[in-house]
A protein has these predicted regions:
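Conserved AAA+ ATPase core "coupling" helix
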Residues: 248-308
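AAA+/SF3 P-loop NTPase mechanochemical coupling elements
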Residues: 185-194, 223-240, 251-260, 264, ...
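AAA+/P-loop NTPase substrate/partner-engagement loops
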Residues: 152-178
Length: 410
């Protein structure tokens, strides 16, 4: 992932469209809605006036200038970060979706520290009816995160530990003969939940992986010709270990494509790790803390309602062409042996809509697409043999690709 630039960046000065008040914002907010502190009028940040140079904080997050031309794209830092503070910085209005998003992240933060990409990416996938693949070393709190998320959302949580001898029926369930009724009765498997943690999914063979394909795409299980619907919302969070390769199986492309995002859980920062130690310094059972400290802030009905509302977020025709151009370039970009499928474009559009709703907007912008591009594409492309030999990373190639695409003026 790109680090924020440490060099100074100019601020942009423009006038409020209602009262004429001079407003000054970072260049990164060009094209976004800004609320005037004097009259509360919402005005689109415009480049009509020249920016006034000012030293920027080295920690300021860089975002794509939505009015940039092709030449300027070469020198811009495109934000591929999903950070909680960026959601607050770019918020346009206090909409019901944004209010709920803030409540959920606040409650999760009571027990789960850091990992902004994991938290935001999972919530975007949940409210887009998608699924998440998490690449992470052991011990970073994935199970705690899923349990906390289930508590906050008020939906049941299930966990499957994938092993080499795990059978499809161990996931989906199977018919069992009932001695009392002398009939076969379907015994549901652990997949019949709403928040499923598929731990170390790459330790099972392809036969077991195939059992998840229908579940993830159709939200149902078919046993002996009879379909059993899963309760909605339904979210699969699958994990794989990037270090240990012995005894693992590569996930087939068909299954990788079913995951909306591939998120990277990394080691926490120094301050975050210190906070983790403080949280666990009290010898209190985790179940007790979940019960007493974390509150349920939503319901199944509200989740489904907001998911439906997010599908109505406006996507301009120029933004559709922008998404299409990014996806199509992955198929011809040097360093990629296999590019992304049309399903990647659908995921980018759906994710951009949901992220825009989290920002409090009723329309999507190129920044929304840029921030979810890496999680959407990194597992859908395959490096060429030459790129692997040279040690070039997927994220590096994708970042260069995204920078090469002209950002539309909306």
């Amino acid at each position: 992932m790109n680090e924020p630039p440490s060099s100074s960046t100019p601020n942009l000065t423009f006038n409020c469209g209602k009262c004429g008040e001079a407003l000054q914002v970072p260049q990164s907010l060009v094209g976004t809605d800004v609320s005037c502190p004097k009259c509360q009028q919402v005005t689109v940040a415009s480049t009509a006036q020249s920016p006034i140079p000012q030293t920027a904080d080295a920690n300021t997050t860089a975002f794509t200038d939505v009015t940039a031309n092709t030449d300027e794209n070469q020198s811009l830092e495109i934000s591929t970060r999903l950070e909680l503070n960026s959601v607050d910085a770019l918020s346009a209005a206090e909409t019901p979706t944004k209010i709920l998003f803030n409540k959920i992240t606040t409650e999760i933060g009571k027990l789960f520290v850091g990992q902004d990409e994991l938290v935001i990416g999972t919530l975007v996938a949940l409210f887009s009816s998608g699924h998440v693949l998490i690449e992470s070393v052991p011990g970073l709190g994935k199970t705690l995160f899923v349990r906390t998320l289930g508590r906050v959302l008020g939906i049941p949580f299930g966990r499957i530990q994938f092993t080499a001898d795990l059978m499809p029926s161990d996931i989906t369930g199977a018919p069992m003969f009932d001695m009392k009724t002398q009939e076969f009765r379907f015994r549901p498997g652990p997949v019949f939940t709403q928040l499923l943690l598929a731990d170390e999914i790459n330790r099972s063979p392809a036969k077991t992986h195939a059992a998840l394909l229908e579940i993830m795409q159709e939200f149902r299980v078919t046993i002996d010709g009879k379909s059993h619907a899963l309760d909605r919302p339904f979210l699969v969070l699958a994990t794989q270990n990037p270090i240990e390769s012995e005894g693992t199986y590569n996930l087939p492309e068909a299954q990788l494509d079913r995951f909306m995002f591939k998120l990277m859980a990394t080691y926490p920062e120094k301050d975050e790790e210190a906070n983790i130690l403080r949280l666990h310094s009290e010898q209190t059972d985790i179940n007790e803390r979940l019960e007493n400290e974390v509150q349920t802030v939503t319901s199944v009905a509200e989740i489904l309602s907001i998911t439906q509302e997010n599908s109505k977020i406006r996507v301009d025709e120029k933004l559709i062409n922008y998404i299409n151009e990014i996806v199509r370039k992955t198929r011809e970009w040097p360093g990629f042996h296999l590019g992304a499928s049309p399903r990647a474009g659908i995921a980018l559009m759906q994710g951009a809509r949901t992220l825009a709703a989290f920002y409090g907007r009723d329309y999507a912008v190129p920044d929304d697409v840029a921030q979810i591009s890496l999680p959407t594409l990194r597992h859908r492309v395959i490096l060429s043999a030459e790129a692997e030999v040279e040690g070039i990373g997927v994220d590096d190639l994708l970042t260069d690709l995204i920078r090469s695409v002209e950002v539309p003026r909306l």
